[in-house]
C-alpha cells in the first residue's frame, strides 16, 4: 500500500509540473526597428516574433529596418555630431557585446562621435 501511495504522489507531482510549465508562456521574442535620424522602436519579451516586429515598427517613425532578437540583446548607435548620418546596430547574446558592436559599426560607417541611442534585451539576453 505504501508503494502505491508513493507512486501516485510521484505521478501527481509530475502531472502538476507538466501543467505548470505548459501554462506559463515563454516570452523570448524581441525586435528593434531602426529608421533615419535616430528614429527607432523597440519591443521585447513578446510571445511571438511577428508581434514584436509589429510593435517595434509602430514605435519607429518613417521607413524603418527591423532586426529581431530571441534570447539576445540589440543595440543602436548613432553619430552624435550628425544624427542623420552614420549609425550602427547589432544583435548579440550579451548586452555588452551588442553595445560594443553597434558602436564599432557606427564608427565603421563614418561616425565621428558615436553614442548608444537605444538598446533592449529580451527574456534571456
Would you name each region that the model predicts?
Residues 5-6, 19, 47, 93:
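Hydrophobic alpha-helical context, especially transmembrane and signal-peptide helices
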Residues 7, 23-26:
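Serine/threonine-rich, low-complexity intrinsically disordered segments
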Amino acid at each position: 500500500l505504501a508503494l502505491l501511495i508513493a507512486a501516485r504522489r510521484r505521478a501527481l507531482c509530475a502531472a502538476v509540473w507538466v501543467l505548470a510549465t505548459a501554462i506559463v508562456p515563454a516570452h523570448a521574442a524581441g525586435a528593434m526597428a531602426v529608421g533615419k535620424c535616430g528614429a527607432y522602436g523597440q519591443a521585447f519579451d513578446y510571445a511571438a516574433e511577428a508581434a514584436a516586429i509589429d510593435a517595434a515598427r509602430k514605435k519607429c517613425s518613417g521607413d524603418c529596418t527591423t532586426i529581431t532578437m530571441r534570447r539576445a540583446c540589440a543595440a543602436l548607435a548613432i553619430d552624435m555630431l550628425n544624427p542623420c548620418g552614420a549609425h550602427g546596430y547589432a544583435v548579440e547574446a550579451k548586452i555588452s557585446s551588442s553595445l560594443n558592436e553597434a558602436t564599432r559599426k557606427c564608427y565603421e560607417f563614418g561616425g565621428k562621435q558615436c553614442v548608444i541611442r537605444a538598446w533592449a534585451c529580451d527574456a534571456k539576453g
